[in-house]
Amino acid sequence: MPSDLAKKKAAKKKEAAKARQRPRKGHEENGDAITEPQVAEERNEEANGRETTEVDLLTKELEDFEMKKAAARAVTGVLASHPNSTDAHIINLSLTFHGQELLSDTKLELNSGRRYGLIGLNGIGKSMLLSAIGKREVPIPEHIDIYHLTREMPPSDKTPLQCVMEVDTERAMLEREAERLAHEDAECEKLLELYERLEELDADKAEMRASRILHGLGFTPAMQRKKLKDFSGGWRMRVALARALFIRPFMLLLDEPTNHLDLDACVWLEEELKTFKRILVLVSHSQDFLNGVCTNIIHMHNKKLKYYTGNYDQYVKTRLELEENQMKRFHWEQDQIAHMKNYIARFGHGSAKLARQAQSKEKTLQKMMASGLTERVVSDKTLSFYFPPCGKIPPPVIMVQNVSFKYTKDGPCIYNNLEFGIDLDTRVALVGPNGAGKSTLLKLLTGELLPTDGMIRKHSHVKIGRYHQHLQEQLDLDLSPLEYMMKCYPEIKEKEEMRKIIGRYGLTGKQQVSPIRNLSDGQKCRVCLAWLAWQNPHMLFLDEPTNHLDIETIDALADAINDFEGGMMLVSHDFRLIQQVAQEIWVCEKQTITKWPGDILAYKEHLKSKLVGEEPQPTRRTHNV
């Protein structure tokens, strides 16, 4: 029987629930959308009917695409761990896609309390493996709930805060049931049980926690109350990520979660994921992020999954040591085999004593062969990206003079009275929070946007190449990379010459002649980089070039940028790439641009200090660059 104290507590909650149910006008309070009766909803749906239909069609198209991918995927495996265990061990795991074998007779080991970084080359099947786990095509025990972040939230009239809170279906269901029972006159033990369960779920703190997560991902309080349909796809992806963090599943699968984040949000997410205590499987090509988050690394290579303890740097060190030992063992075995074969050939038909020794060595050789020989270490293919020589043009290449910019006449000012110049020796990384105008600045410099006030002067012969996140959308998906590049650059007549050009960007063999739609996202990015390089620009403006690229490709890109003769401005959430290629860090915020006095690692520490409310140590300039 419930105690008197529990009854009083329930009575208070019951009264509060009744108060919440009193008639209210259609507005928002504390981030929860409060709507008028069904008539208002129907009126709203009618007004937005066409938009809703378009969204539904796009959503269905994505679902159909996922179903086709799932139909083309075949997975086999056997659960080896105890059915009630919180760990998941799968043996004899094989994975094929469109008949191509991605994994063969390997094992998947995911242990509670571990945060795994899944790494491997572009197109090797990392995302496909996550999808197979998320769809439960891999025999994960049913009591382990899985949340796989696959795509952005579709546009809707809901707010980001509502979208995040509604993902916790158990809490939402319990709150609805509690409100219903609160209006019944009789005392109800069921109501007390509901309140006790809600307390276990920290239901009274749910909104605060959802708001904290959204804030960490860059949503201001005002943005948390805007309608989802007013946000871009990148921001809606952040909402989807916030839902994944809010629900706290037992197994969380994240595929490139930093792709749509700025450096501030990346630092926050890194700190947030460090506290994840269940099972996290993360695909990321940011070495810095993998180092900060992961306790283990899974290397997908040669159709196998190989496991390493520690973060990415520890994986590199351990793998190098293991491969050195493997090569020593390989050479020793090959020397032994050569020696025994030579002895057998020389003395196999000699005297009885020598013949017996030769027979003994032949048996030893047969045992070695039967037990399996050490394989030679096969290194990953080394990429060599290339930006052709651009020639010299005298400075100033681009001059920005008293430039101000706003998107609309009555809109907020993005920049105010900018004054700086860039030349062929410029190596700058633009950093700052989302919405500060980093991509906007690149568009102003290329001429895609015009200043509201002031002037941007460019050398008459300067050629600018801008890489941005939507460049893939310009690809003709029905053409192969070879056909697409031949179409874009008709001056290159020989297919073999074009094959060599594309090959430098890591697209070889069948990848060059397969339709672009069949390539992975990382491989499509390589097509875009090849296309951009052969534009032969003097200035490279790179807006998030690392999205979907593997670690080896990012390193090749860094080498190519460092060898490039022209100027470079970079927007990236990859701290390591910035450290490799940038000579200056420019911070975009508060309608201006200031030069950071240290390197990007010092800037990261500054962002970390902001998370805990500390004041940054460096003193920045307060004037334009």
Curated annotation (Swiss-Prot):
Residues 88-327, 398-615 form the ABC transporter domain. The modification Phosphothreonine is found at residue 220. Keywords: Acetylation, ATP-binding, Nucleotide-binding, Phosphoprotein, Repeat. Residues 1-54 are annotated as: Disordered. The modification N6-acetyllysine is found at residue 306. One of its GO terms (molecular function) is ATP binding. ATP 2 binds at residues 432-439. Gene3D superfamilies: P-loop containing nucleotide triphosphate hydrolases (3.40.50.300). ATP 1 binds at residues 120-127. Pfam families: ABC_tran, ABC_tran_Xtn. The modification Phosphoserine is found at residue 514. Belongs to the ABC transporter superfamily. ABCF family. EF3 subfamily. This is ATP-binding cassette sub-family F member 2. The gene is ABCF2.
